[in-house]
Amino acid sequence: MKRTMIVVTTLLLGAGAVMAQQEVAVQQDNLMRSQARSLYTVILKMTKGDIPYDQKAADEAIANLETDVAKIAKTFEVNPKQDVVNATYGASPKVWKNKADFDSKIPPVQKAIAQVKGKITDVASLKAAYTAINDRCTDCHETYRLKLK
């Protein structure tokens, strides 16, 4: 009986650890998806004319990016050692092998956002803002994002 309890407890602890790791991976994925919604679903689509220019939506997207980018370092503190089930992209193990370099990619994105915040007034200025921000995001994605599918 004692042995059975030990085995069951060990299995439950192991399952709990796996679930906790998946939860961390999901939090990381959700943060990156939120940024993608702001940058690509709103800003990029406006710059391409896929959706009409909307000053309020553009300002909200920039504000959301600013908030989300500030969360990156903390959200990626822990390596979940697994990817989100059925995710298209995931974080490379390089994030945690070279955390200082990963973290150093965040301030340039924040600076790009700060430089355009409050200065977007039309599609042309939105295009310039998109390019400035996306170029900084790409600097990190080239090294630290993996295509899973």
UniProtKB/Swiss-Prot annotation:
Protein residues bound to heme c: 32, 137, 140-141
Cell compartments where the protein resides: Periplasm
GO MF term set: electron transfer activity; heme binding; iron ion binding
Signal peptide: 1-20
InterPro entries referenced in this protein's UniProt entry, alphabetically: Cyt_c/b562 (IPR010980), Cyt_c_II (IPR002321), Cyt_c_prime (IPR012127)
Gene3D superfamilies for this protein: Cytochrome c/b562 (1.20.120.10)
Main localization, broad class: periplasm
SUPFAM superfamilies membership: Cytochromes
One biological process term in Gene Ontology: electron transport chain
GO cellular component: periplasmic space
One Pfam family cited in the UniProt record for this chain: Cytochrom_C_2
Electron transport listed as a keyword: yes
Keywords, alphabetical: Electron transport, Heme, Iron, Metal-binding, Periplasm, Signal, Transport
Coiled coil residues, start to end: none
Post-translational modifications reported in the UniProt record: Binds 1 heme c group covalently per subunit.
Purpose of the protein: Low-spin monoheme cytochrome.
Subunit relationships: Monomer.
Protein name per UniProt: Cytochrome c-555
Gene name of the encoded protein: cycC
